[in-house]
Structure formats: structure tokens, C-alpha cells
């Protein structure tokens, strides 16, 4: 195959897609270039059909350190398991392409995105999604694309397509949108409290801008695309059984079984009804062909269950737990359930329950994030845990799944927007969401529980954040938007639309759409309905914690800050770090910055205060005119040396000790004597001349040191060099 390159303009920069040059043995492969960011994307499928009853699709996002001219920092100096950034980038692509595989397609399919070059300005995540669409479109893999993906920022009130990394730092919006020619099928966003109308406008803007990419991929497919292979679909015996089984199920109490309030009771009732109907139709399960008939009846019953649930929602505005489409489940909240945690809260909404826990740490607890954008330190961590008992199941307990990473990132983006600036609240913050029960919207409950735990810890957040998951049931022109969806409604519905924000605006958004035809008008309606629910939830949260606690939790560590002259940092550190080690031995961690900012961290407030006072003493600077209660530490024929504060002495000349002539210093002062002194002068070398305040104006002042040719040598000529 001859290599061919196709180009289009996107966001004012050229996007080029080349095929036929690299990885030619893959079913589909393309190379994308945008600026100096270069990606290789391949798509491959097995010939044999999987025995799984779902689509075995995997998307891998491979970050190569050579892409930015670096050697990996791991022990073996090679890339290891994908990090969080790579997982989130892979999920963007997965969520965009998965809904467009044909019904019944079960071949194991793999998309691999490899970052070959990264200019650290043009993000590779959305390019990977475009590349996956192109590779699948050109391959022989059955797929109903293409799709395209863009990022939208908002700078100075204007939408910007694919903002650079530098531009994103000034953007109030970070929105990723994927879609087909006629519809949007995936949205992901983090925002600084923008309005719902701004979001809809950004989504519409993105959908218009991605049309050029769709044109490009369709041109490529027409010119160099391969013919799609045929795939086997299991004969669906269940379809013919649905009409009769549906009538029988309704007569046998399907409605009552579906409208059981509790999840486990509902599942048990539906299973009992299904088993009874199957037993009536297959009296002898051991007979020839009975197993196939039973499986077909189970599949048919699942379809009947879905049809009836959707009918109840659309025609009667009645949901499985008895609510209408706009009602939020009952909410129960408890603040500070954990006595030793820095902040904690339990948030329960229906049968979804999350324990949120906040822990405060120092800069030494920052997470070093090493990816292709460079090394950064993350001062806000949010970890989402989804144990199997939360859904009443037994599964292997191990590392985080990709789902957990994605849900945790959504909650993190929602809350990060309201955190105080580090200069105002110099703590590293970790929030953990422990999902204790799950029947839909556990990530949104994590946002609520995490926010409450921050407020319980005394973190001065700008405003409380709440989240709610919205759903959609759509049949032709008829649709109904659902507030606070159940797990069952998520599985059987047409949209999962998670919205997080404050009372003023949206801070995070995630939308996955399973059907085409979701118009901007429907999105506006869903966002408006989500706002009503969000305000309701925020009201319930305010009943328990109307604002962050005025003081940090008694168990939380204390951080004291002070500013010193940068030239005095050496005094705090000491020779070889001796002084700072002595300070930390007092029970605190000390962080010193080059600009003189010092932070003292200790679980013991008294220890932190003691270290602060010690540092102030070490770095205190004397000023002309200040008075001190000092102690004589040394005498000399010409005067006495008086300690003003730790590390700082001054000299009281013999002529300034009394109104009368003093023959010997020891006639007036001795080591250990305390007296009141005042700073009269500080020379260029930092030497301090003292006077006694009570004698000021009664005796002639001494000339400043700089004016005395002989220094303190009693008028004798200076020493020869």
C-alpha cells in the first residue's frame, strides 16, 4: 500500500493523518501529527468470535518517554504499567468508539495509541481518539463510525478549539466533546463554576468544529478503506418469545415486581417471576434442547423487563423505586463519624452510601506526577474505592480498576475548583471516597461526601459542591429525563449524564449517550433539571454543615507560616543542616523556600509554636531605635557586650554607661547583669552600638563607627596592614 497523507485545519493548526507507512500488518493503522505531537494508532480484531456475552474491546494508551526526550525514572529505566493520565486518555477513546460497534459483534478488538512525539502543548488524548476513529474506519473491522473528538477552552469569554497547555492555564473551561455527523456521544468537562448555558454553547461549538475531521476521515475511508469482514451473530431465539412472554409476565405481576422499592428485594422478585415463567414453559430442564430454550427464555425475559420499565417511565412517569422522573432519593448525612480522622462524613442517598474522609499533610506528601507533560507535584489527591460488598458481590480485591480511576478523577475535578489557594491554606489534601453501598451515582455521592469531609476538617473551600447523575429514556420523539438514576436505570436507559457544581455553576460534567438524536434542547433541559436536583442536595448538606468549620479538626496537624529575610536562611539551616535538624527534633517538620517563606508542620500545636519562636529568634533583625532588655555576656576595657536576643549582641561603650566618668567597665556592669538598652547605630558590617535610654540626652553621643577612624582603639592610629 502506498503511503498517503490527508490534512485539515483544526483550531487554527494543521492536523495531518497518514496511512500506509507504519504498522502495515495491523487491520487499521494511522499516524497523526498536530504541531510536534505525533501518534501511531492501530486497530486489530481476532478472527474467531469470543464466547463472552459483551463486546471485548480494550483501548491502550502508551506513553513513551522518548517522545519528550527523556529516559524513564523507573528502576529498569523503561516504561511500566500505564499511569492515571494514560488510563484517563484511554477512557476518552473507549467511551467514544464503544457505542458504535454493531449489535452482536463479539470479536476481541484492541486499539493501541502510542505517543511517538509530544510537544507538551498539543494534548495527545483527543488526538488519540481521532486516530482510533480513523484506524477503525480504514480497517476491515465492522464499526459504524466515524467519530471525531475536540477539546474546548474558554478564555476571556471566547470559546477556543484545542487550546494549548499554556492556554488551558488561563481557561475557565476544559471540555472534551466527541460526536458523529449528527450527534454528540461523549462529553467530559472540568470548569470553574460556569453556567449551564455556557456548557451547552461549548458543546454545540465543538460539534460544529469537529465536522471537518469527520470529512477528512470519510474521505480517507472512501479512498483507502478496507471492506468490512462479516461476523457471526448468535441466532436470537429470544426475539420470537418476547410477545407471548411479555403478556404472561404482566399477567403474573411483572409491574409489582419491578416497582419494588429495595434493590435486593426487586432482584429477588424478578428472578422468582422469571423462574416461574420458565418452569411453566420448560417443565423438564434435563430434556434435549431444554438448556438452549431456558437461555432463550432468560434473554427474552430481560427484554420484557427492559420494555416494561421503559414503558412505566415514559407513559406513567413511574420508576422502579416508586419515584417520578424529577425526585431525588431520600438523603441522610452524618458529619464526623470517625473520631481520629481530620475530617469525615457519611453521605447516603437512597441505597447509595459513601464515606468521605479528608486527611491533611505537608508538602512532603505531594504526589510526584511524571508523564509526558513533565514532572508536576499534585497537592490534591482524591481516591475512589469501590469494594465488591457495596453491590452485594464477591470479587477479587486488588488494585484500582479503570472505572475507579475514571470515577475518582471526575469527583476530583468537581471538588478541585473550590479548593483554597495553596498560599492561603498550605496543606496537601487527600480525600478518600469509600463506597459502602451502590445503587447508582456512587461517583456523585463521592463528590458530596468528599465535600462534607473537607468542610468537617475545616478546609476553607470557596463553596460546597454536590453532584447528581441524570438519565434519559427515549423512544422516537418521546423522551423523559430522569433525576438521580438507579443502577437499573443506568443499564437500561439511553444516557448517563453526571453533573457536579456549586449553587452558582458547574464544576465538572460527564456524559455518555447510547442513542443518536440527543438535541441541544434535551441537553439544556437535562442541565436545568440537574441544577434543581443539585440545589436540593446542597440544601440537605447545608442542614448538617452550612459552612466549613471555623477551626481545623482537633486531630488535624497545624501549619504555621512566617517570612524571613532570604539572606538569613543560612541561620535557620545551620552548618551542614545542623540547625534545621535541631528544629525538627523539637517535633515539627520545617520547609524553607528560597524566597524566605518558611512553613512549620506539626501534629502538636505547641511544638509548632515553639519552633516558630525559635526561628524568629534566629532570624530576628535589630533596628535602630529599638529598645531591648539585654544581658551582659562579655566585658572589655572599652565597653560591655550585651545580648539583645538569641544570636544578636551589641556593644555599650564605656563612655555611654554613666553620666560620670567610668574608669573600669566592671565598676558599672558585670557578666550576667540585665539592663535596658537602645540601638543607636548599626554599621555596614552589622555591628551595633548601644546606649542606655535613661541617659539619652544627658551625655554626648558617640560618633557612628563609620566616622571613627580608629574604631574602638581609643583614638590610637589604625594598625598597619
Swiss-Prot record:
CDD domains, alphabetized: KH-I_PNPase (cd02393), RNase_PH_PNPase_1 (cd11363), RNase_PH_PNPase_2 (cd11364), S1_PNPase (cd04472)
Task performed by this protein: Involved in mRNA degradation. Catalyzes the phosphorolysis of single-stranded polyribonucleotides processively in the 3'- to 5'-direction.
Native source organism of the sequence: Deinococcus geothermalis (strain DSM 11300 / CIP 105573 / AG-3a)
Gene Ontology cellular component annotations, sorted alphabetically: cytosol
Protein name: Polyribonucleotide nucleotidyltransferase
GO molecular function: 3'-5'-RNA exonuclease activity; magnesium ion binding; polyribonucleotide nucleotidyltransferase activity; RNA binding
Subcellular compartments: Cytoplasm
Classification via SUPFAM superfamilies: Eukaryotic type KH-domain (KH-domain type I), Nucleic acid-binding proteins, Ribonuclease PH domain 2-like, Ribosomal protein S5 domain 2-like
EC number: 2.7.7.8
Domain S1 motif span(s) in chain numbering: 625-693
Amino acid at each position: 500500500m502506498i503511503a498517503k497523507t490527508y490534512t485539515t485545519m483544526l483550531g487554527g493548526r494543521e492536523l495531518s493523518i497518514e496511512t500506509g507507512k507504519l504498522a502495515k500488518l495491523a487491520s487499521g493503522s494511522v499516524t497523526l501529527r498536530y504541531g510536534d505531537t505525533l501518534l501511531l494508532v492501530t486497530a486489530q480484531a481476532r478472527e474467531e468470535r469470543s464466547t463472552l456475552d459483551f463486546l471485548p474491546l480494550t483501548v491502550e494508551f502508551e506513553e513513551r518517554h522518548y517522545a519528550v526526550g527523556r529516559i524513564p525514572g523507573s528502576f529498569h529505566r523503561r516504561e511500566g504499567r500505564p499511569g492515571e493520565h494514560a488510563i484517563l486518555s484511554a477512557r476518552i477513546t473507549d467511551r467514544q468508539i464503544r457505542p458504535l460497534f454493531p449489535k452482536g459483534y463479539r470479536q476481541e478488538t484492541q486499539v493501541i495509541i502510542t505517543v511517538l512525539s509530544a510537544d507538551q502543548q498539543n494534548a495527545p488524548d483527543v488526538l488519540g481518539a481521532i486516530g482510533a476513529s480513523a484506524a477503525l474506519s480504514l480497517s476491515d473491522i465492522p464499526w459504524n463510525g466515524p467519530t471525531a473528538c475536540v477539546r474546548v477552552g474558554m478564555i476571556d469569554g471566547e470559546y477556543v478549539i484545542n487550546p494549548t497547555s499554556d492556554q488551558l492555564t488561563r481557561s475557565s473551561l476544559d471540555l472534551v466533546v466527541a460526536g458523529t455527523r449528527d450527534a454528540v456521544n461523549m462529553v467530559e468537562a472540568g470548569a470553574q463554576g460556569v453556567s449551564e448555558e455556557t456548557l451547552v454553547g461549548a458543546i454545540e461549538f465543538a460539534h460544529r468544529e469537529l465536522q471537518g475531521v469527520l470529512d477528512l476521515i470519510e474521505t480517507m475511508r472512501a479512498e483507502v478503506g478496507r471492506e468490512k469482514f462479516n461476523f457471526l451473530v448468535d441466532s436470537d431465539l429470544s426475539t420470537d418469545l418476547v410477545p407471548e412472554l411479555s403478556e404472561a409476565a404482566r399477567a403474573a405481576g411483572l409491574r409489582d415486581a419491578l416497582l419494588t422499592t429495595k434493590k435486593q428485594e426487586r432482584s429477588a422478585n424478578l428472578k422468582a417471576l422469571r423462574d416461574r415463567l420458565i418452569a411453566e414453559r420448560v417443565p423438564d430442564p434435563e430434556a434435549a434442547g431444554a438448556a438452549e430454550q431456558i437461555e432463550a427464555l432468560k434473554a427474552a425475559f430481560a427484554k420484557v423487563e427492559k420494555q416494561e420499565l421503559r414503558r412505566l417511565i415514559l407513559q406513567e412517569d413511574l420508576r422502579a423505586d416508586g419515584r417520578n422522573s424529577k425526585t431525588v432519593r431520600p438523603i441522610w448525612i452524618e458529619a464526623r463519624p470517625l473520631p481520629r480522622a481530620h475530617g469525615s462524613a457519611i453521605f447516603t442517598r437512597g441505597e447509595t452510601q459513601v464515606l468521605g474522609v479528608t486527611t491533611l499533610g505537608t508538602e512532603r506528601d505531594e504526589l510526584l506526577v511524571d508523564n509526558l507533560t513533565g514532572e508536576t507535584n499534585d497537592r490534591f489527591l482524591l481516591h475512589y474505592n469501590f469494594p465488591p460488598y457495596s453491590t452485594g458481590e464477591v470479587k477479587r480485591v486488588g488494585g484500582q480498576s479503570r472505572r475507579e480511576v475514571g470515577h475518582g478523577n471526575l469527583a476530583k475535578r468537581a471538588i478541585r475548583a473550590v479548593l483554597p489557594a495553596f498560599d492561603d491554606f498550605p496543606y496537601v489534601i487527600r480525600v478518600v471516597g469509600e463506597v459502602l453501598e451502590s445503587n447508582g451515582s456512587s461517583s456523585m455521592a463521592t463528590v458530596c461526601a468528599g465535600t462534607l469531609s473537607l468542610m468537617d476538617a475545616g478546609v476553607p473551600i470557596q463553596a460546597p459542591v454536590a453532584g447528581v447523575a441524570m438519565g434519559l429514556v427515549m423512544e422516537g420523539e418521546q423522551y423523559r429525563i430522569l433525576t438521580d438514576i438507579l443502577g437499573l436505570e443506568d443499564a437500561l436507559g439511553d444516557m448517563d449524564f453526571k453533573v457536579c457544581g456549586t449553587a452558582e455553576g458547574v464544576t465538572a460534567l460527564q456524559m455518555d449517550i447510547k442513542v443518536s438524536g440527543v438535541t441541544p434542547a434535551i441537553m439544556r433541559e437535562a442541565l436545568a433539571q440537574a441544577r434543581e436536583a443539585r440545589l436540593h442536595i446542597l440544601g440537605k448538606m447545608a442542614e448538617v454543615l452550612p459552612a466549613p468549620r471555623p477551626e481545623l479538626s482537633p486531630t488535624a496537624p497545624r501549619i504555621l507560616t512566617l517570612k524571613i529575610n532570604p539572606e538569613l536562611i543560612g541561620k535557620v539551616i545551620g552548618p551542614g543542616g545542623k540547625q534545621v535538624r535541631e528544629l525538627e527534633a523539637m517535633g515539627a517538620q520545617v520547609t524553607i523556600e528560597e524566597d524566605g517563606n518558611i512553613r512549620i508542620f506539626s501534629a502538636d500545636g505547641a511544638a509548632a509554636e515553639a519552633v516558630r519562636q525559635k526561628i524568629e529568634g534566629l532570624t530576628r533583625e535589630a533596628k535602630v531605635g529599638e529598645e531591648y532588655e539585654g544581658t551582659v555576656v562579655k566585658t572589655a576595657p572599652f565597653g560591655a557586650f550585651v545580648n539583645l536576643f538569641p544570636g544578636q549582641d551589641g556593644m555599650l561603650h564605656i563612655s555611654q554607661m554613666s553620666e560620670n566618668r567610668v574608669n573600669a567597665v566592671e565598676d558599672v556592669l558585670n557578666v550576667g547583669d540585665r539592663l535596658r538598652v537602645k540601638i543607636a547605630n548599626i554599621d555596614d558590617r552589622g555591628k551595633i552600638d548601644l546606649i542606655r535610654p535613661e541617659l539619652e540626652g544627658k551625655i554626648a553621643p558617640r560618633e557612628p563607627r563609620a566616622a571613627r577612624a580608629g574604631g574602638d582603639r581609643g583614638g590610637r592610629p589604625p594598625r598597619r596592614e
